[in-house]
Curated annotation (Swiss-Prot):
One GO cellular component term: cytoplasm
Protein family: Belongs to the CDC123 family.
Function: ATP-dependent protein-folding chaperone for the eIF2 complex. Binds to the gamma subunit of the eIF2 complex which allows the subunit to assemble with the alpha and beta subunits.
Protein name: Translation initiation factor eIF2 assembly protein
UniProt key word Cytoplasm: yes
Main location: cytoplasm
This protein's UniProt keywords: ATP-binding, Chaperone, Cytoplasm, Magnesium, Metal-binding, Nucleotide-binding
Top-level taxon of origin: Eukaryota
Gene Ontology biological process: eukaryotic translation initiation factor 2 complex assembly
Underlying gene: cdc123
Region of interest (Disordered), ranges: 73-101
Binding positions (ATP): K124, W127, A129, K131, R195, K196, E205, R207, R221, D260, D274, N276
Species of the source: Aspergillus niger (strain ATCC MYA-4892 / CBS 513.88 / FGSC A1513)
Amino acid sequence: MPHIDSEAPAPAAEAPTEQLTRLPFPPVTYSHILHCSYHHWQPRYRTLVPKSRAIRLTAPFVKYLRADGIVLPPEAAPPTDDDNLDTFSDDGADEEPDPSVEWPEIHNQIKSTITEYGGKVTPKLNWSAPKDATWMSATNDTQCRTANDIYLLLKSSDFISHDLEHPFDDCVSDTTTTDDSSSTPPEIPYYLVLRKYVNFNPSLEFRCFVRNRVLLCMCQRDQNHFDFLFPMRDSLRSRIQTFFDEKLKDTFTDPNFVFDVYIPPPHDRVWLIDINPWAERTDSLLFSWMEILHMKDPVDDAPLFPEFRLIKRDDPEAYAFTTPQYSAHKLPKEVVDASISGPGGMSEFLGKWQDILAKQAQESDSDNEDQ
């Protein structure tokens, strides 16, 4: 974890006396995950979020997102002088089928929303944005100008795959307090959220942690040092606290949650960006979940001074250019797993890879001899 600057002592609790095998979260219910889905909370906080549109997805479109491979609808190319030359035309014999014929209404809604929002949008599903797939984008961010830009990001993202395949991992039904794998998860109404593209300043986005409707702590989201944030810390904390007290504290469905805000210049308005589950799957960023879970509640309704963590200038781990964010998602899973298991695991993987290459070379030589 990067070194942080903390001007106020955290409301820490005593360290646990026995070794824990898992973080002491309360049971995460199916309903809590659904309450953190964009389609659930956005209508209630419509005036607090950037301009966006949620498109209800049909079963054929969800099936398309889940399918292996990336097949994009054809895009009309501008006419050229070569269009009149039919010498080498194959009449489209090798063209892939158009997947959008199975969901034309979704395709048209996406295109019309892009036009309505000035030609640029950023996509997400119920919980996640495809931030891990920006390496597939020509702009190296989640900015999308066409429907195919959106499909490419969604189908290239592990985060989106998790929304589709594992939204209820480690969850329990609302009628039990223990892990019950036999319970049937509820059906999920999937939505594609298209937000009007705004060039966000990542230094001004903050993550805030709420337990029992008390704002415990907050921190910057981008893990780089920003010197200008330090003189602003008290005023930013005050604005976030006021925003929470007036807009979220008594209105969000659950008492425990994590929310993200954005406070652009002139820093007098707080925008709600996302609401996340109070669960280990949510990145605790500059805190550890263990210290958050062991923070003490205020006594007798005494006001709590939430800790606001920022990254210091002299933190060598704070400069993200050394390790690009989501870099692990750009590699095959086998490579990531091998690197996690240490030098031995990577050596074993490289040995297997060399064997595969050698076998392919032998097969290629055999094919050449047969010709």
